[in-house]
Amino acid sequence: MRALSLEQANAIIAATFAAAEQHKCRPMSAIILDAGGRVKAFQKQDGASMLRFEICQGKAYASLALGRASRLVLAKAKEKPLFMQSAGELADQAMFLEGGGQLIRDAEGEVVGAIGVTGDVNEMDDICAIAGIHAVGLKSDYDFDDPEQIRKLSILKAPPLTDPRKK
């Protein structure tokens, strides 16, 4: 597994913010964690409110800790609250259970890090995060369609993302 570079991390965040501007999102914040859960980069747009670092980090950390998009971690919390309570205690409450956290994978599907984005509705946080990942030629779980590869990589696919503000 190759490491995620600082240059890639900063480029992912820049592309995430560009997508947010394109979609007319509220001020965003984004964090990149390496595969070991350590902070690689964080940025907060002007006008973003407080606690954004902690929220972004919690979304990305939840994705890494449980190997799935943070919106699927939220679904698991609803299915198995005792499991998630125990996991939260083990993680010193470091996980934030909302959409906006995505695993970052290389071309082979190995996890090289995670992104956490917050500032708008969860779906838009995810859409912008995935745009950032794609901008540097990396992949999210949404990019894998081969059933054998999905099984091998233990990918859990979330339902397709759409902008809920356009309903």
Each model region followed by its residue ranges:
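Flexible, solvent-exposed loop/hinge segments and secondary-structure transition points
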Residues: 1-167
